[in-house]
Amino acid sequence: GISAKTQLSKLSTGLQTAAKLVVALNVNANYVFLDEPTLGLDANHRELFYKELVKSYQEKPRTFVLSTHLIDEIQQLVEYVLILADHQLIADADVEEMLDRAHTVTGPEKLVDQYVAGLRVLSTDQLGTVKTAYVYDQLDDQRVIPDQVKLGHYDLQKLFIELTNGGSKNE
């Protein structure tokens, strides 16, 4: 543990972060802003923080604004996302709505290209004759999916990466 007499500046980065988080989670405010809150914490302590964040929210519902690069770790915690790239707001939406638009389309190159025509394709990967398109768009129920083409979804971190890389040359 941390002695009450120990100066914050004498602690390791991880312990400084932990001490600051204890204060942040116990502050009586309607909005709590946390910039890279898990900086210096190992995986176990990050997980503990996320659990304490949820517990704190359940005890006193309020808005937590998190700025983080560890998107995969917070995906299950967040309801709403703002994504900034080059000082520009590029996404401002409910997480569930965003993920409902994040699709992978995989199959033979020609069939994938035909299927994604007219859709917002953020990027593509290709391995031999198999192509994967990362689509960020609503898929029309009228689109016929060829048997050789598989649809899937991707997570918030992959969507963040694709959106902040400026979209695709395929748009």
What residue ranges belong to the model's regions?
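C-terminal coupling/interaction segments
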Residues: 123, 127-171
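ABC transporter nucleotide-binding domain
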Residues: 54-65, 69-135
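Short, surface-exposed beta-strand/loop "edge" segments at domain boundaries and coil↔beta transitions
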Residues: 32-37, 112-115, 139-144
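ABC transporter nucleotide-binding domains
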Residues: 1-65, 69-72, 76-79, 85, ...
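Residues that scaffold the ATP/ADP-binding catalytic core of kinase and kinase-like folds
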Residues: 24, 114-115, 159, 163
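Conserved protein kinase catalytic domain
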Residues: 50, 99, 160-161
